[in-house]
Amino acid sequence: MAQMTMIQAITDALRTELKNDENVLVFGEDVGVNGGVFRATEGLQKEFGEDRVFDTPLAESGIGGLALGLGLNGFRPVMEIQFFGFVYEVMDSVSGQMARMRYRSGGRWTSPVTIRSPFGGGVHTPELHADSLEGLVAQQPGIKVVIPSTPYDAKGLLISAIRDNDPVVFLEHMKLYRSFRQEVPEEEYTIELGKADVKREGTDLSIITYGAMVHESLKAADELEKDGISAEVVDLRTVSPLDIDTIIASVEKTGRAIVVQEAQKQAGIAANVVAEINDRAILSLEAPVLRVAAPDTVFPFSQAESVWLPNHKDVLETARKVLEF
């Protein structure tokens, strides 16, 4: 075991798969020589060579097309979109081609592409760099969307993503890159995609969330505990496909739920989770399921982040509304 930040765990996962499989390639803007804008690929080009870890032009559409072609020719590309706000440039390759390849070819062709990208607020970047656009890609059939909240989860999930035979969007919250360390096995391990994790057991309320909001939700759960309220925190980890069984099991146990996301409220992951709960567990509910999310505006300039982003106080306020219903 070693104490790792999330960025170190991601680097370790990439190194593991580059060693394990000569068909794994890692590339993107500034990924090679500089080791990535956040140094996630630092040292990998020197270790594995320019043919396997390399820089690309500043053109997301070209990076996506390259990954698509490599995936169809026996490689396992790990492409990086430098910030997920730039995903619009590559959506045709991702949702129009990669996601449909298995269906189009009747299972004869697949796109084993991993799309890594930083996202999320709290670090005062320009708005396009921080956008939470997971809902945009999660809506596309044929794509898995993974968002880890801890270093341990990041390594295991990324290894699983690279080994998956279909496209996986792997989103890394910038605020979590170096905010804390955690014990992470130095040997390889995997975490199954599509499986949520109960980060805190509880009996009175289910808080269902993912990414950086896991930590805000855990803070809120600590505050609720002071009032004698036992809150369960469910980390989705994979937002597409959802782990419906874990969500419903938690809600049926507690009878109350809130769903927390950093992204804007409209058409988000939280809305999908609420709909699934209402479809499958409405008779178990003792109160309406409420959401915590950002306002339906564009991501603000960095000075306004603190009033725009959801935090543990918002989670706490919403939880109390549900508990008092």
UniProtKB/Swiss-Prot annotation:
InterPro entries: THDP-binding (IPR029061), Transketo_C/PFOR_II (IPR009014), Transketolase-like_Pyr-bd (IPR005475), Transketolase_C (IPR033248)
Keywords, in A-Z order: Cytoplasm, Oxidoreductase, Pyruvate, Secreted, Thiamine pyrophosphate
SUPFAM superfamilies on file: Thiamin diphosphate-binding fold (THDP-binding), TK C-terminal domain-like
EC number(s) given by UniProt: 1.2.4.1
GO cellular component: cytoplasm; extracellular region
Subcellular location: Cytoplasm; Secreted
Broad class of where this protein is predominantly found: cytoplasm
Record's keyword annotation contains Secreted: yes
A single GO molecular function term of this UniProt record: pyruvate dehydrogenase (acetyl-transferring) activity
Subunit structure: Heterodimer of an alpha and a beta chain.
Name this polypeptide is given: Pyruvate dehydrogenase E1 component subunit beta
Organism of provenance: Bacillus subtilis (strain 168)
